[in-house]
From Swiss-Prot:
Keywords: Repressor, Ribonucleoprotein, Ribosomal protein, RNA-binding, rRNA-binding, Translation regulation, tRNA-binding. Gene3D superfamilies: 3.30.190.20, 3.40.50.790. This is Large ribosomal subunit protein uL1. Part of the 50S ribosomal subunit. One of its GO terms (molecular function) is rRNA binding. It comes from Shewanella sp. (strain ANA-3). HAMAP family: Ribosomal_uL1_B. InterPro entries: Ribosom_uL1_bac-type, Ribosomal_uL1, Ribosomal_uL1-like, Ribosomal_uL1/biogenesis, Ribosomal_uL1_3-a/b-sand, Ribosomal_uL1_CS.
Length: 233
């Protein structure tokens, strides 16, 4: 049997795996247990009452968190003409068409988000094998294929998170950093849950948001009592 590290022993002693924690208590616990030598992210896992094997029950989208994620996001935009100037003015680091595609083919991937105007998809489509596996392929459902590229750039910079359920029907994303205030983390989590509820598939039956857990990068998950969250029904 593998020997538990001192950190894991402390976590096991502090976190009750059978308990639903009030959101403020959960955040306080995460902060207490965050002892890594870097500022850890606060991640969330949301178990949804969907059948991920059915395409009409998959949940995918994006939402801007009110307090951002604490990450600096580099944005690449495929567009041209006036849209290119607007994207640059909005803060995009990389803007282009075929020239940008050639950079990516050459292995230059110094960006976190890719946005494209509809007329640029003929170029972006040829990069599917490169961008797809990295989760960077633009998609209308996440607002990254849009005629208004400037707004999409601003959203990405403001702390937009993209979400998509995995094969087990679970959404994984980040809601901030452990040095955020409890109010900031609570409001970010509430914004995410509200967005997920709005994205509920019409055919999904029964309890939709089944479980919500938050954790730090190096920590264990803490289950949240959803009654302590202020979210849309």
């Amino acid at each position: 049997m593998a020997k538990l590290t001192k950190r894991m022993r402390v976590i096991r002693e502090k976190v009750d795996g059978t308990k639903l924690y009030e959101i403020n208590d959960a955040v306080a616990l995460l902060k207490e247990l965050a002892t890594a030598k870097f500022v850890e992210s606060v991640d969330v896992a949301v178990n949804l009452g969907i059948d991920p094997r059915k395409s009409d029950q998959n949940v995918r989208g994006a939402t801007v968190l009110p307090h951002g994620t604490g990450r600096e996001v580099r944005v690449a935009v495929f567009t041209q003409g006036a849209n290119a100037e607007a994207a640059k003015a909005a803060g995009a680091e990389l803007v282009g068409m075929d020239d940008l595609a050639e950079q990516i083919k050459a292995g230059e991937m110094n960006f976190d988000v890719v946005i494209a105007s509809p007329d640029a998809m003929r170029v972006v489509g040829m990069l599917g094998q490169i961008l797809g596996p990295r989760g960077l392929m633009p998609n209308p459902k996440t607002g990254t294929v849009t005629p208004n590229v400037a707004e999409a750039v601003k959203n990405a910079k403001a702390g937009q998170v993209r979400y998509r359920n995995d094969k087990n029907g679970i959404i994984h994303t980040t809601i901030g950093k452990v040095d955020f205030t409890p109010v900031q983390l609570k409001e970010n989590l509430e914004a995410l849950i509200s967005a997920l509820k709005k994205a509920k598939p019409a055919v999904a039956k029964g309890v939709y948001v089944k479980k919500v857990s938050i954790s730090t990068t190096m920590g264990a998950g803490v289950a949240i009592d959803q009654a302590t969250l202020d979210t849309a029904n």
